[in-house]
């Protein structure tokens, strides 16, 4: 049978209001009474309901997390950083997978609000205009981390994809690349746009032109990388920039199966740097996004909003670095 606040109050011979004050950390309780109530709570194994506690404290110490797919290695690293900081600040997380479905995202968002969460963090994927409107109208703070399609009015944490693309393109040109292609997916359109901006800026400065810009029809997966290579096979560039590691590996394996030498004849670089990049041969060159930190900093930013702390910068840009491994010269 579930132990209730009434059971604790009866056993400790105090009012339910006193038990509530002890549970919520109210200082206006005598030490002797507090110790007695805590002893009964421990003995009866009473677990306060977060929403019930929230009625007294106006907080549930619960945050909602909207994530495209936690089984994806990219998103799981973001989620781990978030969760560690949430625990550090005594918050519990309700994690919901949206599957990059805009309708499902809206449903999850409204469901989390109905659960009286103290804040919501949106991890990865792309924010639609409709979702931006929901966020701007939200009754609780919302932070987006590692998410494409950011808005200046929405608190966010990410890297600068445009600057990363400019660095990569310049380096590959130095190594002899004269023709380039960009491969991304429909769920990373904004990141792809930012990469494209940096790529074309450097190409224009060097009087070079961009070849293919391919949007994969589905998620940024190995299979989509294989399909992308098939489309480019008759007119391969010197270098391919891929938004995801899985796409890049699909392209690399397809190229090698076709007898094309990587990186001598085709250079490949990605923007995720998940654990996969070191599990393939040659190892994949990649932009190192501090995925754990992006999740962690996003959660810390959310705790500041939830606790009315001073916010120095609502749109945080974390540093990146580029690891040139075996798929580039």
Swiss-Prot record:
<dbReference type="InterPro" id="IPR028082">
    <property type="entry name" value="Peripla_BP_I"/>
</dbReference>
<keyword id="KW-0805">Transcription regulation</keyword>
<dbReference type="Pfam" id="PF00356">
    <property type="entry name" value="LacI"/>
</dbReference>
<dbReference type="InterPro" id="IPR046335">
    <property type="entry name" value="LacI/GalR-like_sensor"/>
</dbReference>
<comment type="function">
    <text>Global transcriptional regulator of carbon catabolite repression (CCR) and carbon catabolite activation (CCA), which ensures optimal energy usage under diverse conditions.</text>
</comment>
<feature type="domain" description="HTH lacI-type">
    <location>
        <begin position="1"/>
        <end position="57"/>
    </location>
</feature>
<dbReference type="GO" id="GO:0000976">
    <property type="term" value="F:transcription cis-regulatory region binding"/>
</dbReference>
<dbReference type="InterPro" id="IPR000843">
    <property type="entry name" value="HTH_LacI"/>
</dbReference>
<keyword id="KW-0010">Activator</keyword>
<feature type="DNA-binding region" description="H-T-H motif">
    <location>
        <begin position="5"/>
        <end position="24"/>
    </location>
</feature>
<protein>
    <recommendedName>
        <fullName>Catabolite control protein A</fullName>
    </recommendedName>
</protein>
<keyword id="KW-0238">DNA-binding</keyword>
<keyword id="KW-0804">Transcription</keyword>
<dbReference type="InterPro" id="IPR010982">
    <property type="entry name" value="Lambda_DNA-bd_dom_sf"/>
</dbReference>
<dbReference type="InterPro" id="IPR006377">
    <property type="entry name" value="CcpA"/>
</dbReference>
<keyword id="KW-0678">Repressor</keyword>
<dbReference type="GO" id="GO:0003700">
    <property type="term" value="F:DNA-binding transcription factor activity"/>
</dbReference>
<dbReference type="Pfam" id="PF13377">
    <property type="entry name" value="Peripla_BP_3"/>
</dbReference>
């Amino acid at each position: 049978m579930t132990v209730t606040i009434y059971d604790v109050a009866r056993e400790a011979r105090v009012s339910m209001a006193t038990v509530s004050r002890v549970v919520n950390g109210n200082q206006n309780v005598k030490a002797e009474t507090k110790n007695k109530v805590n002893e009964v709570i421990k003995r009866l194994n009473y677990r306060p309901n977060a929403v019930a506690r929230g009625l007294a404290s106006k907080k549930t110490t619960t945050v909602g997390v909207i994530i495209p797919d936690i089984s994806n290695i990219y998103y799981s690293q973001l989620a781990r950083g978030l969760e560690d900081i949430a625990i550090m600040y005594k918050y519990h997380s309700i994690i919901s997978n949206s599957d990059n479905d805009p309708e499902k995202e809206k449903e999850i968002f409204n469901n989390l609000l109905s659960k009286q969460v103290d804040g919501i963090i949106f991890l990865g994927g792309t924010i639609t205009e409709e979702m931006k409107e929901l966020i701007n109208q939200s009754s609780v703070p919302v932070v987006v981390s590692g998410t494409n399609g950011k808005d200046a009015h929405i608190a966010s944490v990410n890297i600068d994809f445009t600057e990363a693309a400019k660095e990569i393109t310049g380096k590959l040109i130095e190594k002899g690349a004269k023709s380039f292609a960009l491969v991304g997916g429909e769920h990373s359109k904004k990141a792809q746009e930012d990469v494209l901006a940096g790529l074309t800026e450097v190409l224009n400065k060097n009087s070079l032109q961009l070849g293919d810009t391919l949007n994969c029809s589905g998620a940024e997966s190995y299979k989509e990388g294989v399909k992308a290579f098939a489309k480019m096979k008759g007119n391969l560039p010197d270098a391919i920039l891929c938004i995801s590691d899985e796409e890049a590996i699909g392209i690399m394996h397809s190229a090698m199966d076709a007898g094309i030498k990587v990186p001598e004849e085709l250079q490949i670089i990605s923007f995720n740097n998940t654990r996969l990049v070191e599990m393939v041969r040659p190892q994949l060159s990649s932009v190192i996004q501090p995925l754990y930190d992006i999740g962690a900093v996003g959660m810390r930013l959310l705790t500041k909003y939830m606790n009315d702390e001073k916010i120095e910068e609502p749109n945080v840009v974390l540093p990146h670095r580029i690891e040139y491994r075996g798929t580039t010269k």
